[in-house]
């Protein structure tokens, strides 16, 4: 009870802080430009997660970028599902042949487009769609305080997903197997706030050909957004992957043993920003 109250107060204070920044800068200020280690990036000043870290610390996700760069070469083709504003895409693009980037949130997509231009990144193609199991129109909520947390309308829309009163819009979604002309990627990164399950349902062909899959794993997303079990989630991981690395635990296991570890993590409400499946 006390823990839940703590988080509600925390979310409330974040929302107030974001609104205060917006008032101080004025409604006409849609982005500020940060010269960061990730690149020259336009960020929403109201964003207190990725945007805040870029503004305050001058970087975001450098450890993850290093891990990804160790898994690709200058000849690699990479698919990023959930590109946000490009803080990972832009540095990764410097070390591979090509990146295809998917971003469903139109506000984030506009910043992504701006940031590619600011960094003169020419080997990234971007698509303002949602990845799903089929072609459909989905309800999508656009968070401001944590714009990277924007997501498909959860089946169980907990307070933690809606504390900043996100606008809910219609977004066109597609099976990536059907939408993308290209289906050969060396590395695929999926981080779409609980919709990973639906995306993987619609990209069986693409997944079957990749060498490395990195996918977010958060128990509350599996439960509230997708409403699926760990077993259902893992059923979509192609069988040619034999190893699972869990960066948050600094552990690598055979996939079958890794599945047991993930179930334990789910039971303990422990997540990981990017599980790594490899051959």
Label every model-predicted segment:
Residues 136-146:
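Polar, low-complexity loop segments and adjacent catalytic/binding residues used for recognizing
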Residues 210-218:
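Conserved beta-strand signature within the Rossmann-like core of class I S-adenosyl-L-methionine
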Residues 56-79, 121, 125, 137-139, ...:
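Short internal loop-to-helix segment that lines adenine-nucleotide cofactor pockets
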Residues 125-127, 245:
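General small-molecule cofactor/ligand-binding pocket signal
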Residues 1-119, 156, 161-165, 179-181, ...:
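S-adenosyl-L-methionine
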Residues 81, 102, 190, 215-216:
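Active-site flanking residues adjacent to catalytic metal/cofactor-binding acidic residues
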Residues 130-133, 175:
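Conserved acidic residues
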